[in-house]
Amino acid sequence: MAETVEELTVAYEDGGIQTVKELDKKVLTKGAWATLIFRYQDWNKTKGEYGPDKYTIRRYQKQNGEYRQKSKFNISSKEQAKSIIDVLSAWAGDD
């Protein structure tokens, strides 16, 4: 497990193949609880290529010096991401 927020990743390798490729990450909050958003792609074994961009928001809690994942929310498409952006922009817009 990761000891720092910077070490947290969604990248995953299985059998020498990177099945989850992390493209970017942003740290939203740091501390005993950390929130990060990741942009990533899954490996499509059938096609032999990476699929479309996906996004995930993950919450980690630091326990005994290591961050442990406590929750996640997966955003499976650009369309869903844009819908979330639209709603949050409307809710958090200027007063």
Residue ranges and their predicted role:
Residues 1-78, 82, 86-95:
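Positively charged, low-complexity terminal tracts
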